[in-house]
From Swiss-Prot:
Gene Ontology molecular function terms on file: adenylate kinase activity; ATP binding
Reaction(s) the record says it catalyses: AMP + ATP = 2 ADP
Residues annotated as binding AMP: T31, R36, E57, L58, V59, G86, Y87, P88, R89, Q93, R156, R167
Assembly behavior: Monomer.
UniProt: ATP binding residues: G10, A11, G12, K13, G14, T15, R128, T137, F138, Q195
Originating gene: adk
Name this protein carries in UniProt: Adenylate kinase
Location(s), subcellular: Cytoplasm
A GO cellular component entry from the record: cytoplasm
Function comment: Catalyzes the reversible transfer of the terminal phosphate group between ATP and AMP. Plays an important role in cellular energy homeostasis and in adenine nucleotide metabolism.
Length: 212
């Protein structure tokens, strides 16, 4: 089974990806892991990626696409299938993935889209606070400290609501064309992500069993 998992930051995509890998035995291919492995193994694309990263530059799409292609060509993919997590990030990468899969004789079986209302995600992502003395991390709503005093805690710039909202807006603008592309191919299953983790996975599992 060859899959993509898609979701906005905070939607719980990583948690569900780990559960899919555990339950269905597919190879988990995340962008970060791919880059680290390619650079550690000094593959052609890994060396290219490192040259950009060392200069503090963004890795261009053709290198990222090349690293994905190297990984999808490995033997375990044909045996186990894959779950791509964090790629494609743009419609151009989605088209490149289509071409790579065709070249390698692989087929995408499904796209799992973990849907959560953006306003809920702002609450999830902007609630993180850090204790000034201990460095411990809490959440205002989901994991509040016992003796909360506002002056004892601070919030990182990245976690402030306006910053979180901007980040989500960028992700939605990039993600919509990708979802539309896969919807036209009849591959997308929408999963309601604003429920208990076990309930989300029950819906994911049901969808994937129907694909088998």
């Amino acid at each position: 089974m060859n899959l993509l998992i898609i979701g906005l930051p905070g939607a719980g995509k990583g948690t569900q990806a780990a559960k899919i890998v555990e339950e269905f035995g597919v190879a988990h291919i995340s962008t970060g892991d791919m880059f680290r492995a390619a650079m550690a193994n000094q593959t052609e694309m890994g060396r290219l990626a490192k040259s950009y990263i060392d200069k503090g530059e963004l890795v261009p799409d053709e290198v990222t696409n090349g690293i994905v292609k190297e990984r999808l060509a490995e033997d375990d993919i044909a045996e186990k299938g894959f779950l791509l997590d964090g790629y494609p990030r743009t419609i151009e990468q989605a088209h490149a993935l289509d071409a790579t899969l065709e070249e390698l004789g692989l087929r995408l079986d499904g796209v799992i889209n973990i849907k959560v209302d953006p306003s809920c995600l702002v609450e999830r992502l902007s609630g993180r606070i850090i204790n000034r003395k201990t460095g411990e991390t809490f959440h205002k709503v989901f994991n509040p400290p016992v003796d909360y005093k506002e002056e004892d805690y601070y919030q990182r710039e990245d976690d402030k609501p306006e910053t979180v909202k901007r980040r989500l807006d960028v992700n939605m603008a990039q993600g919509e064309p990708i979802l539309e592309h896969y919807r036209k191919l009849g591959l997308v299953t929408d999963i309601e992500g604003n429920q208990e983790i076990t309930d989300v996975f029950a819906d994911v599992e049901k969808a994937l069993l129907e694909l088998k």
